[in-house]
Structure formats: structure tokens, C-alpha cells
Amino acid sequence: TLCRHDLPIICYSDYKDNKITKAFYGRILIEKAAAFLFYRKEGKTKDLIHALKYKGHQQIGTFIGDWFGVILKDSNEFKDIDCIIPVPLHPKKQKQRGYNQLTTFGLSLSKHLNKPYITNVLIRTSASKTQTFKQRFERFSNNDTKFSIADISSLKNKHILLIDDVITTGATLESCCKELLIAENIKISIVTMAYTE
């Protein structure tokens, strides 16, 4: 059984000048960013995320979301968000997998932050091959993922909390943000389950 004390918690959330926020400097404009766990090539976090994504263990998303949600609620950094939006799966991949691995994580954050979890605004329009076994450079150079917005007017004047499972290069989140930033007077913050150094 997995003990909470075995997990490599980083929890960058209480200050803006953190490694995750810095990872997006000069790439996209975000308000703030936070992640809960370190993701290493071999380790507990990798096992958890793999079980969540490929083994159907959606309770892992709830577990991480509940734990991190309490921390984020107590932090002053994310009190002004308006809604939570997940990085979407392509419909074909979601049908194949049967679920989006971010759903339980997002719903748990929604419960603790008391903000709506919205899944029908950001749409993935191209299916990408799994990134799981690619090296960091391969992930960055091969990122041709495309997104679109279903209802851009609904994002006007909103502060969006964009969520994902793992930040490796940040390329997928960057693609999402570029699309979201088309909306008028929008602000974006990012929260993920894990971060790869």
C-alpha cells in the first residue's frame, strides 16, 4: 500500500516566483502556477499517474485532488479564479480510454475551491500519440496538438484555472493557453498533479 509520506510533494502554490511559473516565462502569459508532486522517471508519482491514466484507477485523481484542493483553498494565490478547465482528450482517445484522467482531479478541486468544473469549452481537435514513453526533447519537438474554443464569449473577463496531469515541457499547456488567450480580458493560471524537473 502507498503511504502519503512516500510521495515526493513539492506543492509550489504559495508564491509566484516558483519553477513552474518560470517555466512559462517568455512563452505565454499566466498569472500563477502550481503542482503537487515531483514526477521522476522511476518513482511513486509515475506509478500513480500511470495507474490513473491507463489502469482505470480514477480514485487516484480524487485522492490527489482532495489533498491538493485543501492546500490550494488555504492559499491566497488561487482565490480569484472563476472556473476550472481541464486539458481535453481528443474524443477518439477518450472513447478508447473510457474517461479523461483529469475528471476526478478536476471535480475534487472544484469541490474544495467552490468553482465550476467546465469540460465543454476547450476542445482538442487533433489526436496526438501517447507522450508517455517519449524523451523530453521528443515531446517538445513533436507537439503538434491543436485546440479550439467552443464558446469564446463565455470566457470573457474570466480567470481560468487550467489543469493537467503532468508538466514535462509545458508544450501542451502552452498550446491550450494560446487558444484561450484569444478570449477578451482573460487570465489563466495553471495547476497540475505533477511537475517534471
Please give the residue ranges for each predicted region.
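Glycine-rich phosphate/pyrophosphate-handling loop used in enzymes and phosphotransfer proteins
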Residues: 1-197
